Amino acid sequence: MSAVSNGARRRRIAVVGAGLAAARFAQQFLESGGEAELTLYGAEARPAYNRVLLADVLTGRYDPEAITLPYGEPGARLRTGTEVVAIDVRGRTLRLANGESAAYDELVLATGANPVLPPLRGLYADGELTAGAHSFRTLADCARLAEDAVRARRAVVIGGGVLGVSAARALAALGLPVEIVHQAPHLIERHLDEQAGQALRRGLLALGVDVYPGNRARALHGDGRVTGVELANGYVLAADLVVIACGARPRTGLAHSAGLAVRRGVVVDDCLATSAPGVYAIGDCAEHRGTVHGLAGPAWEQADVLAARLSGADPAARYTGSRPLARLTAGPLEYAAFGEVGEDLPGTDVLRLADATRGSYKKLVLRGDRLVGGILLGDLGTVGALTRAYERDDPLPADPLHLLITQGAAQW
């Protein structure tokens, strides 16, 4: 599939989106020998970058340019600041916000996700976020937040998932007192169990971040600028800087308007094909076998499979799902979580090792002699050996307890 018979015209592949999945696809397509006129359309004014590192840009650890991702340049063309507003799947054309039309032979949707903004009273003023309130999804968001943080006295982060914890840690590093309001009983509940969540909370407290789990924000206070966050119980947290970190929702508007099958995300099969001929979807916007991953690892895997198929390097390549690893790198608060980590799972045994002095916590979930899930918090010395065993479904040694110890895992 590396060439298309269209007379002298080159095959045209359009990629809507210029984030991690899009950049990875373009790079792998070209490195695999793919031949096409490959164009990426990015609504943001910047080249592709790694959103996972936004908190480190906020603290000043990295310059924005340092998190830029390769996208196969110069073989691929990247059109920044170019929003696609409509897709004609029958005519195989895109309509751009500037009125221009662009034809394609094959289309890859890598539109990513939008931040979820909860229905908080006082969140908007004149159709914009109230002054002092911020989302945290893009480099532009990061720049605005950094500018506001210089003048701020107290910050509240609404949402205690991965993004919220990252933002809180970064704001604390800038010298701000920070409070997290989180509706769930403990932090990062999608990846961590209660014990790990509590250990993470203690680590944040040591950095100057307080946490209010099991609480819901219902309103922002302030006249023209945020002065506080009102909780559902009526208590008000003083703040002149608020970060909304309530997760993300697949960006499916273009696909839906074009008539593609959409549930939570754009529905794709094992070939990453959508319901429209010649149209594919990868990354945060894609729903495969009922799952929207929303993680970097699966996005890369999907991009690699689609690049192999469309380049002709492996036309039979299939994406059958991921065994994703969720990871947060935040100094002493770093963690990794994978697989099934819930309690009372049928047919499983659980091994735990906690060190309150070091603030570390490890948990392995076993089914027979196989590792089916794990949590590592504060000490990732064993993460390589354990994730390899999980991803490969390798049998574990007869006494797996030593795998919780760095030296034991290294010898395995």
Question: Which residues fall in each region the model found?
Answer:
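Mid-to-C-terminal Rossmann-like scaffold of FAD/NAD(P)H-dependent oxidoreductases
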Residues: 8-12, 285-382
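FAD-binding core/adjacent interface of flavoenzyme oxidoreductases
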Residues: 1-10, 69, 73-154, 230-232, ...
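Glycine-rich Rossmann-fold phosphate-binding loop(s) that bind the pyrophosphate
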Residues: 17-20, 137, 158-163
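Beta1-alpha1 glycine-rich phosphate/pyrophosphate-binding loop at the start
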Residues: 2-78, 168-191, 385
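C-terminal auxiliary extensions adjacent to catalytic cores
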Residues: 2, 355-412
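Cofactor-binding loop segments of dinucleotide-utilizing enzymes, especially the Rossmann-like FAD-
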Residues: 18, 41-43, 111, 160, ...
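A Rossmann-like FAD-binding core segment of flavoenzymes
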Residues: 35-39, 77-96, 102, 174-270
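FAD-site-proximal beta/loop scaffold in flavoenzymes
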Residues: 128-150, 224-230, 235-305
